[in-house]
Amino acid sequence: FRHPHVFANTKADTSDEVLVNWEILKRQEKGQKSTADAIESVPHTLPSLWRAEKLQSKTAKVGFTYTETVDALKKLEEEVRELREALESGRSADAPHGVKEEVGDVLFMACNVARMEGVEAEEALHCACDKFNSRFRAVEESAGKPLDECSKEELLALWRKAKENLDAKSV
């Protein structure tokens, strides 16, 4: 049932066509009439980055994806512009096209760029959090006084130095 490209009359000239046919058969087997049914079956209880990745993977399997990562990156840049506009407009976070919605769109597209490059967004964010923690610890250790007694300029200078030092160690 699941291998029509081998055992049945289904015609698939390319590997992409095989994958599309495969997804259609998997949906039929699960009683899902459409890709929308398939994506609605992705559990809401998953961490949001994993859920976004699953949604994007399912729709990509039927051809609903960017062909090139650079195109997805352009869309991410567009979403960042929309976020900037929402911030500058003073719209409340929960308003339509407000900051909350636009931040969500930025995260969703960043996840898409990661997926297209074979990077698990959840893992990438975990690593970024660890890197932030390391840098912040270095800032605190090098400050020589409580951080709440440092000016913004001092904190930024300490951050740049911590980033430079830690990045040099990881090379």
Which ranges hold each PLM region?
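Flexible "arm" and connector segments at domain edges
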Residues: 1-103, 108-171
